């Protein structure tokens, strides 16, 4: 299949990478797994068994007229433990490399199908100036955009850092969440070749 390049001749790309079917279930699984992997999960509360003290029963079993109590660290006591105490846990979800790559191929194919993928010959700014980057993006009619190049350009990264709706990634730093989060994805021809190399 062919991909149109902005201001240049169309390029031939692999059907397997850019022309496949959209697998919503797989993409959803990849997004959930990616976001779960970013969770810290270091919460912690103490249950009745974790709270210090409470070994001695507060009063005898019978004869006081009060409800029986074996410890002062039960959940209904002040200073007691939490009923269903949260504990530190690992939220990671396993996703096979083959499935992850298939999800990325599916996303790229959908971006092409919905005209959200903009391909350019090259994209760079001479200095790390936000104004210069905005001018280039406005020239292409782009506002909410992810810029993907084959390698991170420091000037481009610094110029985009202060723009809330613009992000810069290299091909290997692209993930399912960032690829679907923006209105448009701007890729260079070299990045397209790199995607084919990694996902083909």
Swiss-Prot record:
GO molecular function: rRNA binding; structural constituent of ribosome
One example of a Gene Ontology biological process annotation: translation
Record key words, sorted: Ribonucleoprotein, Ribosomal protein, RNA-binding, rRNA-binding
Keyword Ribonucleoprotein: yes
GO CC annotation, single: ribonucleoprotein complex
Keyword Ribonucleoprotein: yes
InterPro entries assigned: Ribosomal_uL4, Ribosomal_uL4-like, Ribosomal_uL4_dom_sf
Sequence segments annotated as region (Disordered): 38-73
Taxonomy, superkingdom: Bacteria
Physiological role: One of the primary rRNA binding proteins, this protein initially binds near the 5'-end of the 23S rRNA. It is important during the early stages of 50S assembly. It makes multiple contacts with different domains of the 23S rRNA in the assembled 50S subunit and ribosome.
Family: Belongs to the universal ribosomal protein uL4 family.
Assembly behavior: Part of the 50S ribosomal subunit.
Protein name: Large ribosomal subunit protein uL4
Lineage, highest ranks first: Bacteria, Pseudomonadati, Pseudomonadota, Gammaproteobacteria, Pseudomonadales
């Amino acid at each position: 299949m062919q991909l149109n390049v902005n201001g240049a001749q169309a390029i031939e790309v692999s059907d397997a990478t850019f022309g496949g079917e959209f697998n919503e279930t797989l993409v959803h699984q990849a997004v959930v797994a990616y976001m779960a992997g970013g969770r810290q999960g270091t919460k912690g509360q103490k249950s009745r068994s974790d709270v210090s003290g409470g070994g001695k029963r507060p009063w005898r079993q019978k004869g006081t007229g009060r409800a029986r109590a074996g410890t002062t660290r039960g959940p209904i006591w002040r200073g007691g433990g939490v009923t269903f105490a949260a504990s530190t846990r690992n939220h990671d979800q396993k996703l096979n490399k083959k499935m992850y790559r298939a999800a990325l191929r599916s996303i790229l194919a959908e971006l092409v199908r919905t005209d959200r993928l903009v391909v350019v010959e090259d994209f760079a700014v001479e200095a790390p100036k936000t104004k210069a980057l905005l001018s280039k993006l406005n020239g292409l009619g782009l506002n909410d955009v992810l810029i993907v190049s084959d390698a991170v350009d420091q000037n481009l990264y610094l110029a985009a850092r202060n723009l809330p709706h613009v992000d810069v990634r290299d091909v290997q730093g692209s993930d399912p969440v960032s690829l679907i989060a923006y209105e448009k994805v701007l890729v260079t021809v070299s990045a397209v070749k790199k995607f084919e190399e990694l996902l083909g």
